[in-house]
Amino acid sequence: MLYFRFPFSEDYNFVDENLDKNPVSFHSFDNLEILDFSGEIESISKDEILSAEILSDSLSSKLPLFEEEQQSDYQQKLLKVIDFIKENDLSKLVISRRKLVKYEGSPINLSRTFLNLCKAYPNAFVYFFIKDEKCWLGAFSELLGKFNKKTSEFETMSLAGTIPVHESWTSKEIEEQKPVTDFIKNILNAYSEKVELSETYDHLSGNIKHLRNDFKAQIVREDVEKIISELHPTPAVCGIPKDFCRKAIGKFEKDPRNFYAGYIRVENDDFVQYFVNLRCAEFFQDAALIYVGGGITAESSPEKEWRETELKAEAVLKNIDFS
Ligand SMILES: C=C(O[C@H]1C=CC=C(C(=O)O)[C@@H]1O)C(=O)O
């Protein structure tokens, strides 16, 4: 099953798994796993979601053997990452961890958790799925791409840099977001004569904010999937050079990213949209793993980076319904 809600919409959707169409698919970070949801996109009411009442008790898998990375270990590792960034002259490298949430005997109401996330993040793409013994929920507003089938306009954004809502930007975040903008600009310029780029502005997300630029470009329909495969993973979730940074992530992160920092493709009559899968968590019968990361630069402070991941984890954590 899959429930989802588009950004700025009040309607909830599900996909009935009956037909040959594949309107929604989840792509893992490493692109090796694609989870398809086939059928028609149908609408579903809040009451129907509530009455289905899906609890963590009903999930088939328990959390496999897992050792959570502690603050001191994570910070030690980030010191090594910073050295690596300096040695290789990288502008940034995105490193992530998994925060463990044990239910301690009180099951989670996953349906209510989904609705809480929808309420808390009106500008986000919010989803909840259970399939092939996997269960994930997420809510985030970063667009990897949006293609308008009628006008052939392609939209995307560069989103990076994080600070608490009431703090002021420093050169660290500004320098962290720039490579994302440059990376996207270079790709779009190869596919379009006309690429529009907005000013940089603040993108609010609960207790934190990010730096953001929006792009618009006229493209041809046949290029959409090619552009997406060049864009993913952007330096907002990986780094540049892409393949070098992907390998470095594999070396520094002790657990796989799975669907975290991958993307979700959703197609309807008007658009094909691709949402970056951040602020997400994997749920098991007895515990959940919240996936969080951040862009590390030569200027990073390991302690601040740890705090940033804690703040990002809050985005999901505070909306979990312990029934
Ligand atoms: C990698 C994550 O966030 C990305 C998106 C916005 C800001 C980011 C940052 O400030 O590091 C990251 O690039 C995450 O939330 O796990």
Show which residues each predicted segment covers.
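A residue-level signal for conserved active-site and pocket-lining positions in enzyme catalytic cores
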Residues: S25, N88, G145, D182, ...
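Contiguous alpha-helical scaffold segments within structured protein domains
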Residues: I44-S72, L78, K102-Y103, E155-G250, ...
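Conserved hydrophobic core element of enzyme catalytic domains
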Residues: Q218-S323
